[in-house]
Amino acid sequence: MSPRIDISIDELPEASSLLDGHDYSSQIIQRIAGVPVILDASGCPHSPFFEVEYDDRTIRFTSRHDNEHIVELGRKLDYVHHNCSGFLKTFFLRIDVIDGHCYSLSNHAKSLSIAFRTGGRVGPFLHLLSSHYFCVNDFSVTQIGRQEVKLSSAACTQTMTIKRIENRWIDVLCFLLGRTMASCNTNMPLLIERYCKSARLHHGLSGIEAVIVFSNKHSPYFADEEGRRNVLSLVDTEAIRRLLSPKLKDPSFDYGVNKSDEQREITAKLSISYDKYYPNKKIVKLIALQLASSGRYHPKLMSSDYFSPQSDWADIHLLLIPNTFNDPIFIYYQLALLTGLGNRMRLQKYLSVLSRYFSGMISRQEFNERAVELFGEAACFLPIGRLSSAFFMRNTFPEEGLRERILNVLLER
């Protein structure tokens, strides 16, 4: 029997935001309740994969395929949405083993599926489960963590199937169709109220850190420690956190920007790049406003994939990473490679500290303290703070207690 989604009008967003159209090769792909459909010339929705019906109270999506084809459906729709760009080929995944159960990418009839999306090869990561690191290439897995974990075992009683879903609307669709048991996505904070009305779904907050990094080796700021400090000193991170706060309703609050009308001479140009990933654009706009208001910089914003050649042109990049300070080893290693810590000598000091940690000569806390000190000296990045991201989890799981254990990891209790 084909799966069907019935969505009450009461659970939909305001009428003004119900349809969000984008032009792709003369076809309009609309988002209705998070489900992509194509509107023909007469405005009627249709899809090669869904029967779409709606009346005054309900919108109904009926799949033309059974559940086993939902992932392929996601691939095909994403293929259309991104103009034949397909999926990212390589990225990193952090995953854990809960209560001795082995979680992997293998398919299993009684598997627990977790949907996730990623904006690049290294970041931003989906922070679902921690402790082990894997490099994923087209669903093949190579472990780069320190502990040995068997990725496929006949003795596994519970397997987690990881679905790579690049499109956020397909992410929601697969969740609604029951193909995924949980979904974590930083595109979701503004959609929390829409979905939390349903008693069948769980929603909560997980932590993702926003970080400004000087990673362009061709930028004059890359080797200019004083210049980096001058730029970072003008960024009001508290104002950015207030801007992103979902509880803040007053539009007249202080953005941390000097609003004086006094005309100042612009002394330096500065380019800032950011991924097309919520809420990066909101953050960089405020950063640009803060820098411009000082009269010392003329910021230019560049939207690009961090790992595309375009990102090398910018002086600063806004990066989203999970739990910068709670999980320092892999995160600081990335930042060290991206920024070079300002000079070769400081980078060598960091690598020496890292080697001592892996050899057991210093503790995790000592490593963290030394890393904070070295990065503070370099002034090559600035943590803005933890952002709000929503995840959704069904209230029923095949194994008793598994939901609570995963929630504890997600919420870092």
Task: Name each model-derived stretch.
Residues Q143-C156, M160-H218, L319-T324:
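Extracellular/periplasmic solute-recognition and catalytic clefts
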Residues A155-Q158, E262-P322:
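Ligand/substrate-recognition segments at binding pockets and active sites
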Residues I7-D56, H82, L88-F91, S131-V136:
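N-terminal lobe/hinge region of extracytoplasmic solute-binding protein
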Residues S2-E11, T58-F61, L112-I114, Q147-L151, ...:
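Short, well-ordered beta-strand elements
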Residues T58, R64-Y79, L177-G178, S198, ...:
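Alpha-helical secondary-structure segments
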Residues E53-V80, C84-D138:
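Surface-exposed binding/hinge segments that line
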Residues D40, R64-H65, A115-G119, R164, ...:
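A bilobed periplasmic-binding-protein/Venus flytrap-type ligand-binding module shared by bacterial periplasmic
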Residues R4-L12, D23-Q30, V35, I98-K110, ...:
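Detector for C-terminal structural segments
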